[in-house]
């Protein structure tokens, strides 16, 4: 690649199932590399498997990238000079490339059935599971005609080179597959429909992709891609062979690869819990890369400025939910209060949770919990006591704080609060401290815990005095009186 050529990377998922974090990590690294180099991020949909692909999954991919803020320069709904960007709409392009490969002798029709290939291996004393034996390379015109007369439908196979296939992986260094270790492989089904093995490198060539950043699990297919790129160059379809970088595997529990069945692999499960994009992307960036030692907390702009695929680690990366949670909590704390309030309201609305506070009071309540939550979903448990239909005193909290000692506290609190003229947190605090800490000589925990349980129903809540202010005089006093009735007479 010359100095004047622009980096072009691609993210090309298949629209099956729900987006998972390993897939998103791949998208993030491609996006960050494009942004770091001033290059182009191409989003392409590999939807050639009609039985597995779904429109629902396609829309989920769009939703995922948009939620995360990983904008694409070319692709669905954006367009670009090398469209269409859905492989299901590129059938004519693949047919033309196949015809040119066949005409140039780079590919050939193969009629052998899997059973015939296995039988030939057994007859020759070879392992029957070796795979295709390149038998059809040497068929005569008469043999091909005979097979066609039988009604056989051939696949198209690429003629693999007789040399070693090697590349300098940007993550793993030099990789070599010995000559003859990869057999001629199918480019089409017997129906003539193109396979991933054709369309993926073909589109990379036609879309002028310069760097392929993808998961380590795809490394064994790279020799086939190299061979096809070489053939595409010879027939004038491709200009170059892209540089490859195979990203480290993401592990789940133990040493197993994180699979779609693992709960933490589901991107939308993290969103539903209340992860914010900044927190999740920060953590995913650390799955195989680091910005610097002892510097795990950073934003996307900082990542883009520092990211180079050459710095990606080749060792497997383990998904650590606790660390992901901790980083998300930090990013929540870093949000502007107004921004946090909007995001919290949206999250609660999405999950059917309404807090019975007006806009100003909700903003104040949001600020109270911003430093006390790990994910947005945690806020509901802290704030739902503002709703009378959600307010209930937890029996364990009552047993702990609303015993005989609680009666005197509540009596003194009710008397003190009755005289508060302006129902604000500072005046509420002053009145309660004077009555309970000075008047009853109680330590703060003993003084305020019964009031917290009475007002919020639990031992864990936002700051007490601010909560009482937002709850309002009438509801606060009503709840304290009701709790006093529970205690009975001192």
Swiss-Prot record:
- Which reaction equation describes what this protein catalyses? tRNA(Glu) + L-glutamate + ATP = L-glutamyl-tRNA(Glu) + AMP + diphosphate
Indicate the transmembrane segments per the record.
none
The GO terms this record gives for MF are: ATP binding; glutamate-tRNA ligase activity; tRNA binding; zinc ion binding
Subcellular compartments: Cytoplasm
| Gene3D superfamilies noted in UniProt | 1.10.10.350, Glutamate-tRNA synthetase, class I, anticodon-binding domain 1 (1.10.8.70), Glutamyl-trna Synthetase, Domain 2 (1.10.1160.10), Glutamyl-tRNA Synthetase, Domain 3 (3.90.800.10), HUPs (3.40.50.620)
Span of the annotated motif 'KMSKS' region: 257-261
Q: Which domain of life is it from?
A: Bacteria
Q: Name one GO biological process term.
A: glutamyl-tRNA aminoacylation
* UniProt-annotated binding residues for ATP: 260
**EC code(s) of this entry:** 6.1.1.17
Chief location category: cytoplasm
Q: Which Pfam families match?
A: Anticodon_2, tRNA-synt_1c
Q: Which UniProt keywords apply?
A: Aminoacyl-tRNA synthetase, ATP-binding, Cytoplasm, Ligase, Nucleotide-binding, Protein biosynthesis
Motif location ('HIGH' region)?
A: 13-23
Annotated Gene Ontology cellular component terms? cytosol; plasma membrane
Enzyme class label = ligase
Other facts noted in the record for this chain: Was identified as a high-confidence drug target.
Function, as annotated: Catalyzes the attachment of glutamate to tRNA(Glu) in a two-step reaction: glutamate is first activated by ATP to form Glu-AMP and then transferred to the acceptor end of tRNA(Glu).
Q: What family does the database annotate?
A: Belongs to the class-I aminoacyl-tRNA synthetase family. Glutamate--tRNA ligase type 1 subfamily.
Recorded hits in NCBIfam families, A to Z, give: gltX_bact
What do we know about how this protein assembles, alone or with others? Answer: Monomer.
Q: What is this protein called?
A: Glutamate--tRNA ligase
